[in-house]
């Protein structure tokens, strides 16, 4: 049992390193400001990390939620709750005011150049294929994002959706925009590891 636990946290550290490496190869860095509404849980991931701290690592919490337990959770807790970064709508993608972040913030819908999975499948696309091969100059998006790791703020009745952003023809990258049915919008540039709020 102990070996399984140690292996899980060792693999989490390796996964974090791999994600950081991929993010360096797929770089987009907009201007950010500290969020006024959200904080993210940061745990030191090593063999001394407790289950609760490791489970909360990377989760985003509403600053104004009185039910959030603040670190330290225990005597030797090394966790922090830090403001996440926020990006003004229109700056989170390389499309400016024609980008998904701007459109979702101001019009509550994706721009017209997005195509859904059913539309792609009708063109012959299958999972693993490059979307641009079947729909040139279109971007893939609109699927439900299940938030299984609960990193994004969770609430009864909240549904998350996702779409690709910032990719060049022929190649999907690690950049995604995520939005909820109740108006929250976040982006990630390292495939769901780190999130930025859209303001």
Language-model segment annotations:
Residues 100-104, 177:
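Generic hydrophobic, helix-prone segments enriched in Leu/Val/Ile
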Residues 33-44, 50-54, 123-199:
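Functional cores of ribonucleases/endoribonucleases
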Residues 112-113:
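N-terminal domain-onset segments
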Residues 75-82, 176-177, 194:
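Catalytic nucleophile-His microenvironment captured as a short glycine-rich beta-strand/loop
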Residues 1-76, 82-99, 117-122, 126-139, ...:
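Domain-core detector
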């Amino acid at each position: 049992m102990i070996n399984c636990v140690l292996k899980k946290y060792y693999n989490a550290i390796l996964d974090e390193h791999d994600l950081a490496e991929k993010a360096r190869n797929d770089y987009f860095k907009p201007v950010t400001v500290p969020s006024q509404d959200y904080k993210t849980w940061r745990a030191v991931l090593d063999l001394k990390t407790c289950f609760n701290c490791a489970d909360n690592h990377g989760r985003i919490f509403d600053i104004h939620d009185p039910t959030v337990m603040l670190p330290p959770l225990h005597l030797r807790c090394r966790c922090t709750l830090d403001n996440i970064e926020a990006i003004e709508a229109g700056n989170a993608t390389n499309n400016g005011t024609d980008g998904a972040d701007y459109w979702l913030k101001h019009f509550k819908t994706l721009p017209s150049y997005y195509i859904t999975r059913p539309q792609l499948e009708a063109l012959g696309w299958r999972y693993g294929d490059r979307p641009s091969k079947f729909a040139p100059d279109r971007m893939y998006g609109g699927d439900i994002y299940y938030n299984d790791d609960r990193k994004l703020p969770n609430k009864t009745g909240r549904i998350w959706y996702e779409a690709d952003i910032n990719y060049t023809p022929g190649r999907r990258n690690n950049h995604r925009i995520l939005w909820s049915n109740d108006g929250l919008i976040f982006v990630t540039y390292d495939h769901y590891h780190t999130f930025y709020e859209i303001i």
